[in-house]
Every structure is written in structure tokens, then in C-alpha cells.
Amino acid sequence: YNFNVYTSCTARRK
């Protein structure tokens, strides 16, 4: 899994 994608999703949720 791409960590960048995960961070993007989390940042957007926050």
C-alpha cells in the first residue's frame, strides 16, 4: 500500500 495515499486520506479526514 502507498503510504502517501494513506496520509492524503487521513489529512483530508482531519
From Swiss-Prot:
Cellular location(s): Secreted, Cell wall
A GO CC annotation given for this chain: extracellular region
Keywords from the UniProt entry: Cell wall, Secreted
Subcellular location, principal: secreted
Designated name of the protein: Monosaccharide transporter
Organism: Taxus baccata (English yew)
UniProt lineage: Eukaryota, Viridiplantae, Streptophyta, Embryophyta, Tracheophyta
